[in-house]
């Protein structure tokens, strides 16, 4: 369960200065497994448990949205065995968690090009999204077969289609229009990006949505990510002076 095992001793942070939308690049599953002499899939399974903890904490803090980078469009270069194991884990995660997500008023959405997935996984995604579609609590977005460049391109293609239909004119196209056609367009932009695993890069994640996001990098491998590390990221965010491109002296 996501909430039933929550540590009641953890006190809520000040909601006035917390981020509304957090995105996490969940990195380090493979290294976590290798360091323990385990198969990579064991690391991914442990990463699934870390994701459950992150969702639980996000609900507790009453964030508006949490977006998790589960599978990038570049991850298809991994071995067939690992990809197959990941897809089965994805199906298991959806089937085992969806009722609990629904009970906790969480709205689940999968962002990315799901057409490349097996029909079984696509059906599972559809059922999960439909079941939680009317919920108005945490917006939980799972980025799967997702890439930031793909997101922008698919948005541009939709705009071109609207122009061809006569709905839009070329001279109407601006940032506000494009914003309506990228993933998660109805949610607030990402405020905070957390990346685990010690790498300091974005890896083609939400390139449009994180334009003014604060970045937090930690050496903690994803399976070891917990509420303490999450709070550390939040405290770092709360100390930032977010200027959104403006001068510090204005």
UniProtKB/Swiss-Prot annotation:
Active site: 27, 75 (proton acceptor)
UniProt cross-references to CDD domains, sorted A to Z: Cis_IPPS (cd00475)
The organism's place on the tree of life at top rank: Bacteria
Swiss-Prot/TrEMBL GO biological process terms: cell wall organization; peptidoglycan biosynthetic process; polyprenol biosynthetic process; regulation of cell shape
Signal peptide per UniProt: none
Catalytic activity: 8 isopentenyl diphosphate + (2E,6E)-farnesyl diphosphate = di-trans,octa-cis-undecaprenyl diphosphate + 8 diphosphate
Any one Gene Ontology molecular-function term assigned to this protein's record: magnesium ion binding
EC annotation from Swiss-Prot or TrEMBL: 2.5.1.31
Family: Belongs to the UPP synthase family.
Cofactor binding annotation: Binds 2 magnesium ions per subunit.
Encoding gene (name): uppS
NCBIfam families xref list: uppS (TIGR00055)
The entry's keywords: Cell shape, Cell wall biogenesis/degradation, Magnesium, Metal-binding, Peptidoglycan synthesis, Transferase
GO annotations of cellular component type: cytosol
Gene3D superfamilies: Decaprenyl diphosphate synthase-like
Cofactor(s) the protein requires to work: Mg(2+)
Positions that bind substrate: 28-32, 40, 44, 72-74, 76, 78, 195, 201-203
Task performed by this protein: Catalyzes the sequential condensation of isopentenyl diphosphate (IPP) with (2E,6E)-farnesyl diphosphate (E,E-FPP) to yield (2Z,6Z,10Z,14Z,18Z,22Z,26Z,30Z,34E,38E)-undecaprenyl diphosphate (di-trans,octa-cis-UPP). UPP is the precursor of glycosyl carrier lipid in the biosynthesis of bacterial cell wall polysaccharide components such as peptidoglycan and lipopolysaccharide.
Assembly and oligomerization: Homodimer.
Name by which UniProt lists this protein: Ditrans,polycis-undecaprenyl-diphosphate synthase ((2E,6E)-farnesyl-diphosphate specific)
Enzyme class: transferase
Binding site for Mg(2+): 27, 200, 214
